Amino acid sequence: MEELRKSVICKASELYYACLERECEAANYPPYKAMGMGYIRFAAEERELFRLLFMRDRSGEEKSDGETEDVKKSVELIMKGTGLGMNDAFMLHLELWIFVHGIASMIATSYLNWESELVSRMVSDAYEGIKARFISKDGKEDKNVR
């Protein structure tokens, strides 16, 4: 039974990554935002698979290499787009991922049914707000907002 469960998770993961790839290739959003919007789209279109991948009990599991690579890619995109160092880019990603995961989870559980335009605006607002904590208007770290 465990082997079947792992196979289903593997196939669900393939479908998730295909959804992310389609979102990125569509070029409707900057690359980093496209990843978050793809995550939310997957939650809306594949509710049960989203729950299986991202809302199951993982207390006995190790992180996969794919998850680690996803974080590295996200951090690199943030560093490239903002000029932030690795630690700040990592924190920005974690904080925004929590926001995006919250929206995706509420959509996957039918708590919310928001249009993609509203979600896009909210993701942009959260990104800009979190980024502002790390960068002041002149591009230097602002120690007063930490």
What positions do the PLM features span?
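Amphipathic alpha-helical packing segments from all-alpha helical-bundle domains
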Residues: 14, 18, 60-86, 90-94, ...
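An amphipathic alpha-helix adjacent to DNA-recognition modules
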Residues: 1-21, 37
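Amphipathic alpha-helical segments that line or abut small-molecule/effector binding pockets
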Residues: 29-44, 48, 90, 94, ...
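Short secondary-structure transition hinges
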Residues: 41-77, 105, 109-112, 117
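C-terminal regulatory/oligomerization modules of transcriptional regulators
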Residues: 107, 138-146
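Short alpha-helical functional segments enriched in proximate histidine and acidic residues
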Residues: 19, 23, 42, 133
